Regions:
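Transmembrane-helix signature of 12-pass secondary carriers
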Residues: 1-234, 259-271
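Short intracellular "coupling" helices and adjacent cytoplasmic loop segments at the cytosolic face
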Residues: 236-248
Length: 271
Protein backbone atom coordinates (compact mmCIF):
# COMPACT_ATOMS: atom_id res chain seq x y z
CA UNK A 1 0.00 0.00 0.00
CA UNK A 2 1.41 3.35 -1.03
CA UNK A 3 1.32 5.94 1.73
CA UNK A 4 2.65 9.41 2.49
CA UNK A 5 4.01 11.55 -0.32
CA UNK A 6 3.93 8.57 -2.68
CA UNK A 7 0.17 8.22 -2.25
CA UNK A 8 -0.25 11.97 -2.68
CA UNK A 9 1.70 12.00 -5.94
CA UNK A 10 -0.19 8.98 -7.22
CA UNK A 11 -3.52 10.67 -6.50
CA UNK A 12 -2.30 13.87 -8.12
CA UNK A 13 -1.44 12.01 -11.33
CA UNK A 14 -4.39 9.65 -11.55
CA UNK A 15 -7.04 12.03 -10.24
CA UNK A 16 -5.88 15.59 -10.96
CA UNK A 17 -8.00 18.05 -8.95
CA UNK A 18 -10.58 20.09 -10.77
CA UNK A 19 -10.10 23.74 -9.86
CA UNK A 20 -13.05 24.90 -11.98
CA UNK A 21 -15.37 22.19 -10.70
CA UNK A 22 -18.53 23.44 -9.01
CA UNK A 23 -17.80 21.35 -5.90
CA UNK A 24 -14.29 22.81 -5.59
CA UNK A 25 -15.61 26.36 -5.92
CA UNK A 26 -18.32 25.72 -3.31
CA UNK A 27 -15.71 24.28 -0.95
CA UNK A 28 -13.57 27.40 -1.36
CA UNK A 29 -16.62 29.48 -0.43
CA UNK A 30 -17.14 27.32 2.67
CA UNK A 31 -13.53 27.88 3.66
CA UNK A 32 -14.10 31.64 3.66
CA UNK A 33 -15.84 31.16 7.02
CA UNK A 34 -12.50 30.03 8.45
CA UNK A 35 -10.75 32.89 6.66
CA UNK A 36 -13.08 35.38 8.36
CA UNK A 37 -11.85 34.17 11.75
CA UNK A 38 -8.42 35.46 10.79
CA UNK A 39 -9.96 38.70 9.53
CA UNK A 40 -11.68 39.22 12.88
CA UNK A 41 -8.38 38.69 14.61
CA UNK A 42 -6.66 41.33 12.51
CA UNK A 43 -9.53 43.82 12.74
CA UNK A 44 -9.96 43.63 16.50
CA UNK A 45 -6.23 43.50 17.20
CA UNK A 46 -5.52 46.71 15.31
CA UNK A 47 -8.61 48.69 16.31
CA UNK A 48 -7.69 50.13 19.69
CA UNK A 49 -4.39 51.64 18.56
CA UNK A 50 -6.33 53.60 15.97
CA UNK A 51 -8.91 54.75 18.51
CA UNK A 52 -6.15 56.18 20.70
CA UNK A 53 -5.57 58.76 17.97
CA UNK A 54 -9.22 59.86 18.14
CA UNK A 55 -9.60 62.85 20.47
CA UNK A 56 -13.39 62.48 20.57
CA UNK A 57 -12.99 58.92 21.85
CA UNK A 58 -10.47 59.99 24.48
CA UNK A 59 -12.63 62.91 25.63
CA UNK A 60 -15.68 60.65 25.94
CA UNK A 61 -13.88 58.38 28.40
CA UNK A 62 -11.69 61.10 29.93
CA UNK A 63 -8.72 59.02 28.85
CA UNK A 64 -5.27 59.58 27.42
CA UNK A 65 -3.33 58.01 24.57
CA UNK A 66 -0.38 57.48 26.88
CA UNK A 67 0.21 56.34 30.43
CA UNK A 68 -1.61 53.84 32.59
CA UNK A 69 -5.12 54.44 31.16
CA UNK A 70 -4.14 53.51 27.62
CA UNK A 71 -2.02 50.62 28.88
CA UNK A 72 -4.71 49.01 31.02
CA UNK A 73 -7.55 49.41 28.52
CA UNK A 74 -5.37 48.09 25.72
CA UNK A 75 -4.12 45.16 27.81
CA UNK A 76 -7.64 43.90 28.56
CA UNK A 77 -7.81 42.49 25.03
CA UNK A 78 -4.63 40.48 25.54
CA UNK A 79 -5.72 39.44 29.04
CA UNK A 80 -8.94 38.09 27.57
CA UNK A 81 -7.00 36.19 24.93
CA UNK A 82 -4.66 34.61 27.46
CA UNK A 83 -7.56 33.75 29.79
CA UNK A 84 -9.21 31.83 26.96
CA UNK A 85 -6.25 29.50 26.40
CA UNK A 86 -7.44 26.74 28.80
CA UNK A 87 -10.76 26.63 26.93
CA UNK A 88 -9.55 26.81 23.33
CA UNK A 89 -8.46 23.18 23.04
CA UNK A 90 -11.54 21.61 24.65
CA UNK A 91 -13.88 23.87 22.68
CA UNK A 92 -12.55 22.98 19.24
CA UNK A 93 -11.39 19.41 19.93
CA UNK A 94 -14.37 18.08 21.87
CA UNK A 95 -17.22 19.99 20.24
CA UNK A 96 -15.91 20.52 16.72
CA UNK A 97 -14.28 23.23 14.64
CA UNK A 98 -17.61 24.81 13.72
CA UNK A 99 -18.63 25.06 17.37
CA UNK A 100 -15.31 26.74 18.14
CA UNK A 101 -15.82 29.29 15.38
CA UNK A 102 -19.40 29.89 16.52
CA UNK A 103 -18.56 30.35 20.20
CA UNK A 104 -15.64 32.65 19.47
CA UNK A 105 -17.71 34.77 17.10
CA UNK A 106 -20.63 34.92 19.53
CA UNK A 107 -18.33 36.27 22.25
CA UNK A 108 -17.00 38.84 19.78
CA UNK A 109 -20.54 40.01 19.03
CA UNK A 110 -21.34 40.24 22.75
CA UNK A 111 -18.08 42.07 23.44
CA UNK A 112 -18.82 44.51 20.64
CA UNK A 113 -22.26 45.24 22.09
CA UNK A 114 -20.79 45.83 25.55
CA UNK A 115 -18.21 48.24 24.13
CA UNK A 116 -20.66 49.97 21.81
CA UNK A 117 -23.21 50.67 24.53
CA UNK A 118 -20.68 52.75 26.46
CA UNK A 119 -21.94 55.61 24.29
CA UNK A 120 -24.67 56.01 26.93
CA UNK A 121 -22.58 56.01 30.11
CA UNK A 122 -18.89 56.49 29.21
CA UNK A 123 -18.06 53.61 31.55
CA UNK A 124 -14.39 52.69 31.25
CA UNK A 125 -15.01 49.52 33.25
CA UNK A 126 -17.72 48.42 30.83
CA UNK A 127 -15.48 49.18 27.86
CA UNK A 128 -12.68 47.15 29.44
CA UNK A 129 -15.09 44.28 30.05
CA UNK A 130 -16.08 44.36 26.41
CA UNK A 131 -12.44 44.34 25.38
CA UNK A 132 -11.88 41.30 27.60
CA UNK A 133 -14.74 39.45 25.91
CA UNK A 134 -13.40 40.38 22.49
CA UNK A 135 -9.97 39.00 23.31
CA UNK A 136 -11.51 35.84 24.77
CA UNK A 137 -13.64 35.25 21.69
CA UNK A 138 -10.92 36.04 19.18
CA UNK A 139 -8.58 33.56 20.87
CA UNK A 140 -11.07 30.73 20.30
CA UNK A 141 -12.16 31.74 16.79
CA UNK A 142 -8.62 32.45 15.59
CA UNK A 143 -7.63 28.92 16.63
CA UNK A 144 -10.68 27.14 15.23
CA UNK A 145 -10.78 28.92 11.87
CA UNK A 146 -7.30 28.08 10.52
CA UNK A 147 -7.54 24.50 11.83
CA UNK A 148 -10.83 24.10 10.01
CA UNK A 149 -9.31 25.45 6.80
CA UNK A 150 -6.30 23.10 6.95
CA UNK A 151 -8.39 20.01 7.70
CA UNK A 152 -11.19 20.67 5.21
CA UNK A 153 -9.27 21.95 2.19
CA UNK A 154 -8.64 19.52 -0.66
CA UNK A 155 -5.11 18.10 -0.12
CA UNK A 156 -3.98 19.31 -3.54
CA UNK A 157 -4.68 22.93 -2.58
CA UNK A 158 -3.94 22.76 1.15
CA UNK A 159 -0.62 24.62 1.09
CA UNK A 160 -1.89 27.41 -1.13
CA UNK A 161 -5.18 27.88 0.72
CA UNK A 162 -3.51 27.84 4.14
CA UNK A 163 -1.09 30.53 2.98
CA UNK A 164 -3.95 32.71 1.78
CA UNK A 165 -5.79 32.14 5.07
CA UNK A 166 -2.93 33.66 7.03
CA UNK A 167 -2.97 36.80 4.88
CA UNK A 168 -6.54 37.55 5.94
CA UNK A 169 -5.21 38.78 9.30
CA UNK A 170 -3.71 41.68 7.39
CA UNK A 171 -6.98 42.17 5.50
CA UNK A 172 -8.72 42.69 8.82
CA UNK A 173 -5.98 44.98 10.09
CA UNK A 174 -6.13 47.13 6.96
CA UNK A 175 -9.93 47.33 7.09
CA UNK A 176 -9.74 48.33 10.75
CA UNK A 177 -7.24 51.09 10.05
CA UNK A 178 -9.33 52.29 7.12
CA UNK A 179 -12.49 52.39 9.22
CA UNK A 180 -10.81 54.36 12.00
CA UNK A 181 -9.17 56.77 9.57
CA UNK A 182 -12.32 57.25 7.53
CA UNK A 183 -14.61 57.86 10.51
CA UNK A 184 -12.27 60.19 12.41
CA UNK A 185 -13.26 63.09 10.16
CA UNK A 186 -16.81 63.00 11.56
CA UNK A 187 -15.62 64.66 14.79
CA UNK A 188 -18.56 63.17 16.71
CA UNK A 189 -19.02 60.05 18.81
CA UNK A 190 -19.86 58.26 15.59
CA UNK A 191 -16.17 58.56 14.70
CA UNK A 192 -15.35 55.83 17.22
CA UNK A 193 -18.72 54.10 17.38
CA UNK A 194 -18.65 53.09 13.70
CA UNK A 195 -15.31 51.22 13.87
CA UNK A 196 -16.37 49.49 17.09
CA UNK A 197 -19.69 48.24 15.71
CA UNK A 198 -17.96 47.07 12.53
CA UNK A 199 -16.32 44.38 14.67
CA UNK A 200 -19.63 42.53 14.42
CA UNK A 201 -19.55 42.22 10.63
CA UNK A 202 -17.22 39.26 10.15
CA UNK A 203 -18.29 37.66 13.44
CA UNK A 204 -21.89 37.86 12.23
CA UNK A 205 -20.95 36.24 8.92
CA UNK A 206 -19.28 33.36 10.74
CA UNK A 207 -22.29 32.89 13.03
CA UNK A 208 -24.65 32.98 10.07
CA UNK A 209 -22.78 30.54 7.85
CA UNK A 210 -20.84 28.18 10.14
CA UNK A 211 -23.74 25.71 10.36
CA UNK A 212 -24.15 25.65 6.57
CA UNK A 213 -20.64 24.34 5.91
CA UNK A 214 -19.30 20.79 6.36
CA UNK A 215 -17.58 19.87 9.61
CA UNK A 216 -13.89 19.00 9.43
CA UNK A 217 -13.70 15.39 8.16
CA UNK A 218 -10.62 14.82 10.28
CA UNK A 219 -12.45 15.85 13.44
CA UNK A 220 -15.40 13.64 12.51
CA UNK A 221 -13.18 10.62 11.90
CA UNK A 222 -11.09 10.77 15.06
CA UNK A 223 -14.24 11.28 17.14
CA UNK A 224 -15.84 8.07 15.94
CA UNK A 225 -18.10 9.57 13.27
CA UNK A 226 -16.29 7.70 10.54
CA UNK A 227 -19.15 7.17 8.12
CA UNK A 228 -19.97 10.87 8.21
CA UNK A 229 -16.29 11.69 7.65
CA UNK A 230 -16.13 9.38 4.63
CA UNK A 231 -19.31 10.93 3.22
CA UNK A 232 -17.80 14.40 3.63
CA UNK A 233 -14.55 13.39 1.96
CA UNK A 234 -16.44 11.65 -0.85
CA UNK A 235 -18.55 14.70 -1.59
CA UNK A 236 -15.94 17.44 -1.33
CA UNK A 237 -12.64 15.74 -2.21
CA UNK A 238 -13.66 12.67 -4.19
CA UNK A 239 -16.30 14.44 -6.31
CA UNK A 240 -18.83 11.76 -5.39
CA UNK A 241 -16.46 8.80 -5.79
CA UNK A 242 -16.21 6.89 -2.52
CA UNK A 243 -13.23 4.92 -3.89
CA UNK A 244 -11.30 8.06 -4.84
CA UNK A 245 -7.58 7.99 -4.12
CA UNK A 246 -7.97 11.32 -2.33
CA UNK A 247 -10.50 9.77 0.04
CA UNK A 248 -8.30 6.74 0.71
CA UNK A 249 -5.24 8.94 1.23
CA UNK A 250 -6.85 10.95 3.98
CA UNK A 251 -8.47 7.95 5.66
CA UNK A 252 -5.03 6.35 5.90
CA UNK A 253 -3.68 9.57 7.44
CA UNK A 254 -6.47 9.62 10.02
CA UNK A 255 -5.85 5.96 10.87
CA UNK A 256 -2.13 6.63 11.28
CA UNK A 257 -2.95 9.48 13.66
CA UNK A 258 -5.20 7.24 15.75
CA UNK A 259 -2.59 4.48 15.85
CA UNK A 260 0.00 6.90 17.19
CA UNK A 261 -2.09 8.99 19.59
CA UNK A 262 -4.93 6.62 20.40
CA UNK A 263 -8.39 7.93 21.07
CA UNK A 264 -8.79 11.63 21.73
CA UNK A 265 -9.00 12.39 25.45
CA UNK A 266 -10.12 15.48 27.29
CA UNK A 267 -6.64 16.16 28.66
CA UNK A 268 -5.18 15.85 25.15
CA UNK A 269 -7.11 18.97 24.17
CA UNK A 270 -4.98 21.12 26.45
CA UNK A 271 -1.72 20.32 24.65
Amino acid sequence: VVTGSGAFNEALIQEPPKLSNRTTILLFLCLLVGFFCQTMNGFDGALFNGLLANTVFLDHFHGSNSGIWAGIVSAMYQIGGVSALPFVGPAIDNWGRRVGMFLGSLLIVLGTIVCGLTITNASVGQFMGGRFMLGFGVSIAAAAGPIYVVETTHPAYRGMVTGYCNTFWFVGSILSSGAVRGAITLQTNQSWQIPIWLQMVFAGLVIGFCWMIPESPRWLYVHGKREKAIETLTKWHGYGNRDSLWVKLQISEYEAHLNVDGSVSFLYSFF
